[in-house]
Amino acid sequence: METLKITVYIVVTFFVLLFVFGFLSGDPARNPKRKDLE
């Protein structure tokens, strides 16, 4: 049961990190005017 809990925590953390990195990397793509001005 402890192993299952650890696995769930790892999976949740992985998805949260994936979402955060995807949001940060997708931010400039959503705001192209910032890139064009520079």
UniProtKB/Swiss-Prot annotation:
Instruction: Establish whether keyword Transmembrane is in the entry.
Output: yes
* Parts of the chain on the Lumenal side: 1-2
Q: What happens when the gene is disrupted?
A: Decreased yields of PSII dimers with increased PSII monomers, slightly slower photoautotrophic growth, about 20% less oxygen evolution. Formed PSII dimers are stable.
Entry membrane topology: Single-pass membrane protein
**Residues where N-formylmethionine occurs?**
M1
Pfam families from the entry? PsbI (PF02532)
Its principal location? membrane
What residue ranges carry the coiled-coil annotation? none
Q: Biological process (GO) annotations?
A: photosynthesis
Q: Which domain of life is it from?
A: Bacteria
Q: How is the cofactor bound?
A: PSII binds multiple chlorophylls, carotenoids and specific lipids.
The keyword Transmembrane helix is assigned to this record? yes
Cytoplasmic-side segments? 25-38
Regions that span the bilayer: 3-24
Q: State the UniProt keywords alphabetically.
A: Formylation, Membrane, Photosynthesis, Photosystem II, Reaction center, Thylakoid, Transmembrane, Transmembrane helix
User: Looking at the UniProt record for this protein, which Gene Ontology cellular component terms does it annotate, in alphabetical order?
Assistant: photosystem II reaction center; plasma membrane-derived thylakoid membrane
Q: Any idea where this protein resides? A: Cellular thylakoid membrane
Protein family: Belongs to the PsbI family.
Which PANTHER family does this entry report, sorted A to Z? PHOTOSYSTEM II REACTION CENTER PROTEIN I (PTHR35772:SF1)
Function according to Swiss-Prot or TrEMBL: One of the components of the core complex of photosystem II (PSII). May be required for formation of PSII dimers but not their subsequent stability. PSII is a light-driven water:plastoquinone oxidoreductase that uses light energy to abstract electrons from H(2)O, generating O(2) and a proton gradient subsequently used for ATP formation. It consists of a core antenna complex that captures photons, and an electron transfer chain that converts photonic excitation into a charge separation.
Subunit: PSII is composed of 1 copy each of membrane proteins PsbA, PsbB, PsbC, PsbD, PsbE, PsbF, PsbH, PsbI, PsbJ, PsbK, PsbL, PsbM, PsbT, PsbX, PsbY, PsbZ, Psb30/Ycf12, peripheral proteins PsbO, CyanoQ (PsbQ), PsbU, PsbV and a large number of cofactors. It forms dimeric complexes. Part of a photosystem II (PSII) assembly intermediate complex PSII-I; crystallized from a strain deleted of psbJ, it forms monomeric PSII before addition of the oxygen evolving complex. PSII-I includes 3 assembly factors not found in mature PSII (Psb27, Psb28 and Psb34).
Q: What is this protein called?
A: Photosystem II reaction center protein I
The gene for this chain is psbI
